[in-house]
Amino acid sequence: MQTWSSPSVPKLRGAPRPLRLHDTATGEVRPTAPGDTARLYVCGITPYDATHLGHAATYLAFDLVQRVWLDNGHDVHYVQNVTDVDDPLLERAARDQDDWVVLAMRETALFREDMEALRVLAPREYVGAVESIPGIVDMIEKLLASGAAYRLDDDEYPDVYFPHDATPNFGYESNYDRETMLRLFAERGGDPDRPGKRDPLDALLWRMARPGEPSWETSIGTGRPGWHIECSHIALANLDTPFDLQGGGSDLVFPHHEYSAAHAEALTGQHPFARHYAHAGMIGLDGEKMSKSRGNLVFVSKLRSTGVDPGVIRLALFAGHYREDRPWTDELFAEAGTRLALWRSAADLESGPSVDDVVARVREHLGNDLDTPKALAALDAWAREAWDRGGPDTEAPGVFRTAVDALLGIAL
């Protein structure tokens, strides 16, 4: 699948700071410690609607991860999937009397446009679930052969399931108790009440064909893959395990990331799936999480169509810490526009106060669990001083501009 074009990332003078990031599995902020090549997997969209600000917040958070790693001299091998066949996509296509393939292609194309406009660094591999079906089937065959998968005793729909206890470490990523798992499993695409399962928490690997649904003829039967096995396969096919970081929104902690890891670990026998699990908070509107199901969405494409500078969107979302659930408000949006104007005015000055200490502080803040509020405050202070009092350093405005571009992805 075609990815989008990445902006260039300028080289910044001075000493970088290594990235320490909150790990969901341990509950600690700890070093990411990649090797020469940092390996990142972030779960992509289910393309049945346009990119909203909740999506943008997640992908911008992991864009910062890439930028800090690049600043530290790492190559970054970034993989992202597209869930281009799944129940929400099929349901939306049926509701709107649309062809599900056309809908998926249209929304995936719009997502790429939005990411490019937001100056998000593109993944090296951008992989759809549909194109991955042969590899997914091979993975399920191996899980069946090893006893880490089973078929339902159902003459009509003998679906294939993954026993949640197939690995000894199930639950290590989310650290949830069974009651919480059951609740979230039911809320987030699971089927705890499916008759014939060995346990309510067992997860679907292969759904046998139903009337009116897309399906593929394979060695394990005609059907389509479950959600979690798609990411397991795509990550295993493109990244050595354990890779450095598995990322996504906080609504993916369970069940998606827990099962993706369990599927892969059951196949390979290698634990953990990823060395680090990081999750971005939700963006709210009118007191509710912004989501397609609720319909309380602010779309990136709609903002762009009204002439909103993508830098304003980035700054508005960076005003809060990436792990926090936070609201989108008109005040936040206005403050971001004011901030961008201040920074651009300061970057256009012929000289200013020394900027190296400020850049060092920005690096320190971003290296400490992507603390963007403190990073933005440090840059604000320099820009105000430069505008109000000036300074003798003729290189400072240019270095300021470079730092904002390299570390925050904002073109001044």
Swiss-Prot record:
GO molecular function per UniProt: ATP binding; cysteine-glucosaminylinositol ligase activity; cysteine-tRNA ligase activity; zinc ion binding
Cofactor note (record): Binds 1 zinc ion per subunit.
CDD domains in UniProt: Anticodon_Ia_Cys_like
Zinc among keywords: yes
A cellular-component GO term for this protein: cytosol
Function as written in the Swiss-Prot or TrEMBL entry: Catalyzes the ATP-dependent condensation of GlcN-Ins and L-cysteine to form L-Cys-GlcN-Ins.
The family this protein is said to belong to: Belongs to the class-I aminoacyl-tRNA synthetase family. MshC subfamily.
Quaternary data: Monomer.
Name of the protein in question: L-cysteine:1D-myo-inositol 2-amino-2-deoxy-alpha-D-glucopyranoside ligase
Organism annotation: Actinosynnema mirum (strain ATCC 29888 / DSM 43827 / JCM 3225 / NBRC 14064 / NCIMB 13271 / NRRL B-12336 / IMRU 3971 / 101)
Lineage: Bacteria, Bacillati, Actinomycetota, Actinomycetes, Pseudonocardiales
Gene for this chain: mshC
